[in-house]
Amino acid sequence: MKHPFQIVLVNKAGTHLFASVKNHLQVFRLSDGKVVGSWIDTVDMFTPLKKQQEEKIKVLQEQNKQTEESENNEIKNESAEPAEKKSKGNDSKPIKIPKIPVPGPGAPPIYNYIRSLALSEDEKHLMGTTDSDKAAIIFKVDLSSEGNCLTLIKRQVFQKRPCAVSSDQETLIVADKFGDVYSIGIDNEAPVDEKELSPILGHVSMLSDVLVATYNDKKFILTGDRDEHIRVSNYPKSYVIKNWLFGHHEFVSNLHIPEFDSSLLVSGGGDDYLCLWKWYDNQLLSKIELRDLLLPFLEEFHLPPERFLTDESQKEISIAKILTFVSKKSQKKYIVVLAENTKCLLTFELKADNTVTHKQTLTTDFPIIDICLISENSSIIAAVDRETSDSLLEFYTLGDEDVFEVQSHTDIIQTITSANECDVEKRREFYPLYYINTLRKRSEH
């Protein structure tokens, strides 16, 4: 069977789908499902560990050199000593090569997979992050190319693992798990040594999402973290904090600014609700309640880990994706919400007075891993968690009464699924599909 797609992303025109599975990135033409771009990350999963080994060797070599110089100086100062003693310091001591550290029992596994993907504003570049060597990757995208439409132009390694990216047309903004945010150019310039990179802003907690936003022709960086904070920083003077948005009680995993109104922000994470903000004005407009709607779709997976499980424990909600669009038919505005590892999509109508009402709960046969939206025709492409070799995607289109319906694209879906080159024998060979809930802080934190 095929390994499910982990990330799906579509261009604004809705003509091409970007999808990742493990360390493989593919671009599909949606008119026929044909592969027009492909890239495989061949970096060794143990590259960071090998770097540690190399650094230790350099330290040992420097220590050995300093010891030899010290001994030689002592011998020169002791001219009365026998010649054989003078030559003692000339014998080079062998360096004991440190072993490559191997994660012990219980250590988190090292995966070689693409952690995040995003298109630049002009869609001329595709950016992502890798888990193997803690790097940001930047591709030039040429959809008119008759060959591979993807060309890797930069791979910038970071000291800490990057977990989220955003960009404008010139700059890639990268957030890492240490709480720092970096800015690197979207260009062909060679990457710099990771130790020379300086963060442009930082949180005291692990970052979970980042956005580049514009308001009144001024740029800002919005960051969400594990400690339920949302920070609004000026950019490029990102040390200047515009606002802190306080409304969440659990981690913030998803920040979304609608294209139809850049003054709004929808945020979600580990709470039972979403927050709707006027982010520039630091105004919380409303909280969108989710628990009653999602409760029928929460399963054993959504319970806390066994060591934290009590009689009072509730099944937990973790927001995987937030999207917004305007219906071409009714011109009404909608919010689409995906909760992690659930067989449903929630749709809410956003009214002119910024009140929000539930519109639809779309039930699916399989858990949804990720979704993306084609704005041109208000349709959704979903990557589904299915043990099959036939259909790893589903298409939903907006029908009458602005209700999503399953659309028949059997041939295209099968063509795309067949092009997925990641075959596995059993489910346990799947890479992480659901990890957002691990951001939730427990009593041990």
UniProtKB/Swiss-Prot annotation:
Q: Where is the composition biased (Basic and acidic residues)?
A: 60-94
Q: Where is it localised?
A: Nucleus
A GO term (biological process) for this protein? Answer: tRNA (guanine-N7)-methylation
Segments carrying the region annotation (Disordered) are 60-103
**What are the WD repeat spans here?**
109-149, 205-243, 247-289
Q: What organism does the UniProt record list as the source?
A: Scheffersomyces stipitis (strain ATCC 58785 / CBS 6054 / NBRC 10063 / NRRL Y-11545)
User: What keywords sit in the KW lines?
Assistant: Nucleus, Repeat, tRNA processing, WD repeat
Specify where it is mainly localized.
nucleus
Q: Which domain of life is it from?
A: Eukaryota
Role this protein plays: Required for the formation of N(7)-methylguanine at position 46 (m7G46) in tRNA. In the complex, it is required to stabilize and induce conformational changes of the catalytic subunit.
Q: What is the lineage of its organism?
A: Eukaryota, Fungi, Dikarya, Ascomycota, Saccharomycotina
Q: Name one GO cellular component term.
A: cytosol
What protein name does the entry list?
tRNA (guanine-N(7)-)-methyltransferase non-catalytic subunit TRM82
* Pathway assigned in UniProt: tRNA modification; N(7)-methylguanine-tRNA biosynthesis
Can you tell me which family this protein belongs to? Answer: Belongs to the WD repeat TRM82 family.
